[in-house]
């Protein structure tokens, strides 16, 4: 779903950019095509620009993640053939099956590589266009490599917890998670968390929290801001797209819409840097995962009728 949305977004924005963009310097880099291609072929723009270390890193993560996912999917298929029944892949993120989790983690790694490569390409392109008057709203110039490194390191910066824009949303999700764990839900029972729950939840949350910020707030929102509308409108539009991209996992992504808007607001307030947003996003997901894994559907109970023997 998310790739379909991204393809439509890129097509529409390309049309808008062509019709509205003014003259740019000859050495200005592509802020739409190169980042877009790098999303689907991680490292492409970096190989082209001669940034070989970054290119190798993005391509390597992409290949490694894709291989992990493919191996896990093959294992799932073999097990299903041997058992003659489905493993339960429809549970998605709620599944505790090792192969299902490896498949999802590998897929997330591959997607993250594309988002990091996209941010890297876009940041360099935006900086190359500043002398033509574009992207002046983005604050001080940073290289694409620096932007990516800042984003992937952000979830470990606990200093963000001193900001009300960080501890309030995390406090809200924490309180809701605690209530969910302690309350009794019909059809569900509380279960102890396993080490694998912590490991998968943390790894998946880290990848989602960093690469989705790179994609939605690091590339999409400033593009909309430059070619379509101002700060508020660009934030609203990106948060709507962010929510729609999560329709595959939730029926009504209202929390994602609100979170996306807050993360966009924080990003704009911080000079269009992604650090605080990546911190909030990552730990929001960690808390949500741990709360979800603390409950499981009650096992089916077979109620047999009483046995009556009549002589």
For each of these PLM feature ranges, what is it?
Residues 76-100, 186-191:
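Flexible, solvent-exposed loop segments that connect beta-strands
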